[in-house]
């Protein structure tokens, strides 16, 4: 088997979004799974729209999710002389030509074609022009598209695709200022980089016949193509920023783990048996572009949150502390190692993101300022207050390093007073945490410690 070489080639006109990252992941997995090469190419030939910040954000996103590319990043803006050389080659071989049609003439032609209910297109009028070029017109360069031929390629996702060359006009490969067009620079770079397989969004499917014309004109080897359907929202519409089509780094800021995001995106448009959870190693072992789906996939926040919660639960306390560094939350320095482990173990089971985990740390470690009203109103204060006073005395005798002892102390009150567990547990929870839900009470007592627990109960009794 020949060496698999893939690439990801974004334009730095905006930040890397979720669909782009998925394309990068597919190309990365295919190359790495076959001990091949994976390159990053920045398609920055549109000098008026390029953004250095956007290019850097793409690189930053790659670093975050762990997509390592081979060699140096290739910037197309540094390769204009190479493209110029290949355009001249086509001109010299009479496979391309200068077109002197002005914009006004082209607009007028299109209006005439529309009036005749024809598809607007250039009419190839300068294809075999031998006369004197009109003055004052900076020409574009057009490729001579072979006529009366059928372009056939077998797309790895779409199947066999056929296009008659008569449906294509002689499209532009160099603008009047000499800069090359997208379709031209793509095929030159893919050929010179030795790209064997192109996995990209199916919005590029219509470009492929034109690119094949150029591959053939320059006698370049045509790569294999895989055109992946776009990602839709849960209503079946094009993904918007509100539904997930946002800067990849926003997901890091929201507290998603890179492992969860890669797993989630790899499964959007690709499947392997009924398996949902994949480590990077498992993805490398299982991924094959032949298994890419031909139908659009749907972005699901519920699914992403479920996956993220799974990966969150599998992090150790030390790993979580490292991951939590970008987020602000209560000081943890007063907790001993056992309390810290217990805090993170208890809360990671109840959190879907790192951001949510940070908020829950605050909720536990910050003494309640007020108490959940609907729970407080239901309390029988005449019964509750004596119970908490008695429990305070019991806590002074308990070893707070022993969760079982803390649990026994609570059950002792319930048994001695012959009351239902909720009659005591609910007010105790309110006193410690300020609300009716949250982590277990023995965990809360253990994490808070004797001094803080007694302080919170005393404050509640005075409220």
From Swiss-Prot:
Q: Write out the similarity annotation.
A: Belongs to the class-I aminoacyl-tRNA synthetase family. Glutamate--tRNA ligase type 1 subfamily.
Lineage, top-rank taxon, reads Bacteria
UniProt-listed NCBIfam families: gltX_bact (TIGR00464), PRK05710.1-3 (NF004314)
Official protein name in the record: Glutamate--tRNA ligase 1
Gene field? gltX1
- Record keywords, A-Z: Aminoacyl-tRNA synthetase, ATP-binding, Cytoplasm, Ligase, Nucleotide-binding, Protein biosynthesis
Task: Spell out the InterPro entries in the cross-references.
Answer: aa-tRNA-synth_I_cd-bd, aa-tRNA-synth_I_codon-bd_sub2, aa-tRNA-synth_I_CS, aa_tRNA-synth_I_cd-bd_sf, Glu-tRNA-ligase_bac/mito, Glu/Gln-tRNA-synth, Glu/Gln-tRNA-synth_Ib_cat-dom, GluQ/Sye
Just give the chief location class. cytoplasm
**Which HAMAP family does the annotation name?**
Glu_tRNA_synth_type1
Its subcellular locations are: Cytoplasm
Q: Name one GO molecular function term.
A: ATP binding
Question: What GO biological process term is on the record, naming one?
Answer: glutamyl-tRNA aminoacylation
Function in brief: Catalyzes the attachment of glutamate to tRNA(Glu) in a two-step reaction: glutamate is first activated by ATP to form Glu-AMP and then transferred to the acceptor end of tRNA(Glu).
Q: Which residues form a coiled coil?
A: none
- Note whether Cell membrane occurs among the keywords: no
Motif 'KMSKS' region: which residue numbers?
238-242
**What is catalyzed by this enzyme?**
tRNA(Glu) + L-glutamate + ATP = L-glutamyl-tRNA(Glu) + AMP + diphosphate
